[in-house]
A protein has these predicted regions:
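Internal catalytic-core helix/loop-beta-alpha segment
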Residues: 37-70
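Short, conserved loop/helix-junction motifs that constitute active-site signature segments
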Residues: 31-34, 86-88
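Catalytic cores of alpha/beta
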Residues: 1-16, 42-55, 84-89, 93-95, ...
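Short charge-dense sequence patches
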Residues: 1, 33-36
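Glycine-rich, small/polar surface segments that engage phosphate groups of diverse ligands
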Residues: 5-29, 37
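Charged helix-capping and loop-helix junction motifs
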Residues: 72-81
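Glycine-rich phosphate-binding active-site loops on the catalytic face of alpha/beta enzymes
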Residues: 20-30, 58-71, 101-137
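Expand to "…catalyze enediolate/carbanion chemistry for C-C bond making/breaking, isomerization
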Residues: 140
Length: 140
């Protein structure tokens, strides 16, 4: 479990980690004997350059959002290609926003370490549909 708020609970219950975002941009451990994974949401390539202190980062929106209508891609393919070649996008950066199986090749070409999927799965009305879509993501 990774918490986006109430970070003191992560330490109290020895949870996996904390996730920083605009609401909660800082984390300071209460003790030295608990080191959680540390992640962050980024919405610009520039934000990734501070990424060395994080275990992983989410960059979004890579493509137009499926679940947030009108939330458009923030990056051109050229920007993502350049950031991937420069190592700014690397194995610790997770692509988020508008992810579908058809876009996995581009995501790999841009050097992302993985994908996070929301709307693509949320649009499925049944558990069987979600499992089918997850299988497509894994196999395609």
């Amino acid at each position: 479990i990774v918490l986006h708020d109430h970070f003191e609970l992560a330490e109290k219950y020895r949870l996996a980690g904390v996730h920083l975002n605009g609401r909660n941009p800082h984390y300071r451990p209460l003790s030295n004997d608990y080191i959680p994974t540390l992640s962050r949401s980024c919405h610009s390539i520039e934000e990734l350059t501070d990424g060395q202190r994080y275990d992983y980062l989410f960059l979004s929106p890579i493509f137009d959002s499926i679940s947030k209508k009108g939330y458009r891609s923030a990056f051109s393919p050229e920007q993502l290609t350049k950031a991937g070649k420069e190592g700014v996008i690397n194995e610790r950066v997770i692509a988020l926003g508008g992810i579908t199986p058809e876009k996995k090749t581009a995501i790999k070409d841009w050097n992302f370490g993985g994908i996070a999927v929301l709307g693509f799965l949320w649009q499925e009305p049944t558990i069987a549909g979600v499992i089918r879509q997850l299988t497509r993501l894994r196999n395609d």
